[in-house]
């Protein structure tokens, strides 16, 4: 089952999501740990280096990246064009964008990464936007919270990975890999399931 919070207006949803990232105390804390958290993200991608290495010269985007540690981690692994996206931009490596209405051209992106599927108010639209933007044989790496309670900013609950997989198939994706997350660190302990989707 995929459950979604009832929010009357899309503008209210946007305001809710920006609230966390624009909080000055949180931003100060995140900025202070930027280098430390970047290093913690490296094993997340390194475990699939044999799958992702072919995208090192492609456009790569980390969606809902806040301060963009995941994009910096990918840059350190040789993905020179990796950037984060968020409703609130940050420095030079996180650009402003909306996951439900992405600015990228059709079939232009090699790889997407995201761990904020639970922050999507319209999961089918989110997946459809990723599918639209990916090149043929492009990949989308999702880290999911399965069966976890929502925090204040989460709007979507996933009870079973099969629910996500079925929705992804409906959009047109092929399931490249689906497995329990084996690389758990203090910053990603709630992300208990990894799925890699492919556009064919």
What are these regions (language model features)?
Residues 1-52:
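Class I SAM-dependent methyltransferase Rossmann-like catalytic core
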Residues 48-56, 102-103:
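Glycine-rich helix-loop-beta junction characteristic of Rossmann-like nucleotide cofactor-binding loops
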Residues 58-101:
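Class I SAM-dependent methyltransferase SAM/SAH-binding core
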Residues 100-112:
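A short acidic, Gly/Pro-enriched loop at the edge of an enzyme's catalytic core
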Residues 110-123:
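A short SAM/SAH-binding and catalytic strip from SAM-dependent methyltransferases
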Residues 124-139:
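A short glycine-rich, Lys/Arg-flanked "PGG" loop and its adjoining helix->strand segment in the class I
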Residues 137-147:
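Conserved beta-strand signature within the Rossmann-like core of class I S-adenosyl-L-methionine
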Residues 155-178, 193:
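Short alpha-helix
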